[in-house]
């Protein structure tokens, strides 16, 4: 994948940096693997906004992605690499020898025409899916299962990968992209390699309109609201928030408050917590 920038013909193109889509080999999706999906627009089943700043955007078709990789021992050929509007990663269209077609997350380096396979006896090659017990130490993996047979739930975004650190008993220690070291059952499956399209972190939308195309509505600062709408609101002119620290619209502490439960049962599987991020890297945006 590569990225392309633009000359400053307009204010929107001055800082615009987008993907060149050079790795995409086929534009139209496989019709048997797409379904229509209702856009929730940040509402729940009662129509109440539960996630702010969502709505609008371009109409999309949802691609059915195979996160389970449960066709063990059946060889598949990579027929195409395609764009997916619902994620930053690309999709690889697989043609299995028994005639079935499936989408998987595109592993970095996998080319059209290459063969991939899943199963405990699969060779140690990028794009193949194996149980963690069969993957060598130090290998990079993605699309990692938390529970055997449920499908990959971790390490699925563009450019992400986890590292196999150790094996002991029924568990394998993985170093996740967040630097957290976590134990996972050895029978859980993972795909070798890292997710492709790692250059997406270098892109820039360039203008507010592109954010609207993605279905993101504007975020209004709390300090410019009325006091009935936000704890930061009110006052004469540009008044301070009048609190020791920023809070959410519902009065809860913002920017750094830990939201994970202290007595969560899965805490025993976390060997090392993720590294803390500084305020500078996290950003001090007014909620």
From Swiss-Prot:
GO terms for cellular component: large ribosomal subunit. Keywords: Ribonucleoprotein, Ribosomal protein, RNA-binding, rRNA-binding. Residues 258-287 have a biased composition (Basic residues). Gene3D superfamilies: 2.30.30.30, Nucleic acid-binding proteins (2.40.50.140), Ribosomal protein L2, domain 3 (4.10.950.10). InterPro entries: NA-bd_OB-fold, Rib_uL2_dom2, Ribosomal_uL2, Ribosomal_uL2_bac/org-type, Ribosomal_uL2_C, Ribosomal_uL2_CS, Ribosomal_uL2_dom3, Ribosomal_uL2_RNA-bd_dom. Residues 221-287 are annotated as: Disordered. One of its GO terms (biological process) is translation. Pfam families: Ribosomal_L2, Ribosomal_L2_C. One of its GO terms (molecular function) is structural constituent of ribosome. Belongs to the universal ribosomal protein uL2 family. Part of the 50S ribosomal subunit. Forms a bridge to the 30S subunit in the 70S ribosome. One of the primary rRNA binding proteins. Required for association of the 30S and 50S subunits to form the 70S ribosome, for tRNA binding and peptide bond formation. It has been suggested to have peptidyltransferase activity; this is somewhat controversial. Makes several contacts with the 16S rRNA in the 70S ribosome. This is Large ribosomal subunit protein uL2. It comes from Synechococcus sp. (strain RCC307).
